[in-house]
From Swiss-Prot:
Family: Belongs to the glycosyltransferase 22 family.
Taxonomic superkingdom: Eukaryota
Role summary: Mannosyltransferase that operates in the biosynthetic pathway of dolichol-linked oligosaccharides, the glycan precursors employed in protein asparagine (N)-glycosylation. The assembly of dolichol-linked oligosaccharides begins on the cytosolic side of the endoplasmic reticulum membrane and finishes in its lumen. The sequential addition of sugars to dolichol pyrophosphate produces dolichol-linked oligosaccharides containing fourteen sugars, including two GlcNAcs, nine mannoses and three glucoses.
Entry-linked InterPro entries: GPI_mannosylTrfase
Intracellular or extracellular location(s): Endoplasmic reticulum membrane
Gene Ontology process terms (BP): dolichol-linked oligosaccharide biosynthetic process; protein glycosylation; protein N-linked glycosylation
Lineage per the UniProt record: Eukaryota, Metazoa, Ecdysozoa, Nematoda, Chromadorea
Known EC number: 2.4.1.260
Gene name per UniProt: algn-12
Name of the protein described by the UniProt record: Dol-P-Man:Man(7)GlcNAc(2)-PP-Dol alpha-1,6-mannosyltransferase
Species of provenance: Caenorhabditis elegans
Length: 492
């Protein structure tokens, strides 16, 4: 492996270590992986999804794969009695490294197609941007699909179009049905140009049908067993989002939000270099245009999240990397080109500064995770006592998962909508808020039977501050108390 390839691996691990928590959108895959690792598949009543099924079901294919790949190290962890919280880092590292290797696989095809310098800059650019590396280890359906998407891009660059159809079909059927919006424009172009055959046994349609049938033959029996009813998860997701059009229940954004907000935040200062790459290499427009069309088509869905378009970030960065490589190669030909080359270096440094701030914020954005961890650390000598802990919905959504239930003698309760009077017998309460009213709520509802043990500060917002001294303008990160642990007054 080359030096910049190792940088991708190292940066991925750094992100995992500094921001180990998970949030509500990752909940199903995290909990399912935990249950597969610690419970027999014949004992589904102990599985988290049996108690908290969520709005739409998700496939178990991803968690099963993650549990199997993590099992050798998991066995070692258990043999040495290492707390299972560390196995959360293990599964995230496993997923992150799978995505890192898929990206490096794609980067090597860029090396063969565009040159060594372009591949080097592609890896460096991706390492200096926060969101792609951050999401690579997040147990999300998008992240499992991302592995296959990178393989699809690699196969397309190598001219292995039929193989690309196979991986594309699998990613759509198993993980993210909306990826058809990405693959449609891509494969349509290859079909029109005659590089991808449409009909016949080896045509795109026949290959897609065969792979879809194979994926359904795997997904439906497995997921039907775990969910206890006949089920194709992505089919239900598609019905929920497209037919019922209920995704707006999770919030909406303006039509162009991906273009003016999400992409600039993902690409950071690299945004300025993407169009320049399109100007210096005629091959790039046909590669980049389908990604633009994908984002445009996806914009019709009212509910928007940055992670929904994470797949196409390497394509935009490829365009920027081509420009950076040209500046590196031609830097000695003129003074102007030397200036542009230094601009390329400065843009990487600017990305690193922004990513450092994002990573700092992310490390303090999981109050539920921090609260339960510190509670268990403070009471580590009571690990074998029958302690009861109540975890409210806000903390459950901001980091608490079954990997954090490290004391077998403790009872962790996440029952929703309990009244304050129902909580008086719990030894500890782990409570959170999404606003700034935590202390007020504690003082008005819970002080009769419990007293605050400690509060957890978490990221609230950032502001742009102005100063008369250098650097004149800088971001200020503001933290507020987002979680509290209360201790029963009768607990000894």
């Amino acid at each position: 492996m080359e030096g910049t390839e190792w940088i991708v691996i190292i940066v991925t691990i750094i992100h995992i270590i500094l921001a180990p928590g998970t949030k509500v959108e990752e909940s199903f895959n995290v909990q399912a992986t935990h249950d597969l690792m610690f419970h027999l598949p014949t004992n589904l009543s102990n599985y988290d999804h049996s108690q908290f099924p969520g709005v739409v079901p998700r496939t178990f294919i991803g968690p099963i794969s993650l549990a199997i790949l993590s099992s050798p190290m998991s066995f070692i962890f258990r043999f040495w009695a290492i707390p299972k919280m560390w196995q959360l880092l293990l599964i995230r590292a496993t997923l992150g490294l799978m995505n890192a290797m898929a990206f490096l696989y794609f980067a090597r095809s860029v090396n063969r197609k565009f040159g060594r310098e372009t591949a080097m800059y592609l890896r460096l650019i991706m390492c200096t941007q926060f969101h792609y590396i951050f999401y690579m280890s997040r147990p999300l359906p998008n992240t499992f699909a991302l592995i296959l998407v990178m393989i699809v891009f690699e196969r397309l660059l190598e001219g292995r179009y039929e193989s690309a159809v196979r991986y594309a079909t699998a990613s759509v059927i198993l993980f993210r049905c909306e990826l058809v919006l990405l693959y449609g424009p891509i494969f349509l172009g290859y079909m029109i140009s005659g590089r991808l055959k449409v009909f016949g046994f080896d045509g795109a349609i026949a290959i897609g049908v065969r792979i879809a049938a194979m994926c359904l033959a795997v997904s439906i029996p497995i997921d039907s067993y775990f969910w206890g009813r006949p089920l194709w998860p992505e089919g239900e997701v598609m019905f929920f989002n497209v037919v019922e059009n209920r995704s707006h229940e999770y919030g909406t954004q303006p039509f162009l939000w991906y273009f003016y907000s999400a992409l600039p935040r993902c690409l950071l200062t690299t945004t300025l270099l993407v169009p320049l790459g399109l100007l210096v290499d005629r091959r790039l427009p046909q590669i980049v245009l389908p990604s633009v069309i994908f984002i445009f088509l996806y914009s019709f869905l009212p509910h928007k999240e940055l992670r929904f378009i994470i797949y196409v970030l390497p394509i935009f960065c490829l365009s920027a990397a081509v420009f950076c490589a040209r500046m590196l190669i031609n830097r000695h030909k003129s003074f102007f080109r030397m200036i542009l080359f230094f601009g390329v270096i400065l843009h990487l440094l600017a990305n690193v500064l922004c990513t450092g701030m994002f990573l700092l914020v992310a490390s303090k954005n999981y109050p539920g995770f921090d609260a339960l961890n510190y509670l268990q650390f403070q009471n580590r000598f009571d690990a074998k006592k029958p302690v009861t802990v109540y975890i409210d919905n806000a903390c459950a959504q901001t980091g608490v998962n079954r990997f954090l239930h490290i004391n077998d003698a403790w009872t962790y309760n996440k029952t929703e909508n309990l009244k304050p009077a129902d909580l008086e017998n719990f030894d500890f309460l782990v409570l959170g808020t999404y606003g700034n009213t935590l202390k007020t709520e504690v003082e008005s509802k819970f002080v009769t039977w419990h007293r605050p043990l400690f509060f957890v500060n978490s990221f609230h917002q950032y502001k742009i501050k102005k100063s008369r001294q250098f650097p004149w303008i800088y971001p200020e990160i503001i933290y507020t108390e987002k979680a509290v642990v209360l201790k029963n007054r009768n607990y000894k």
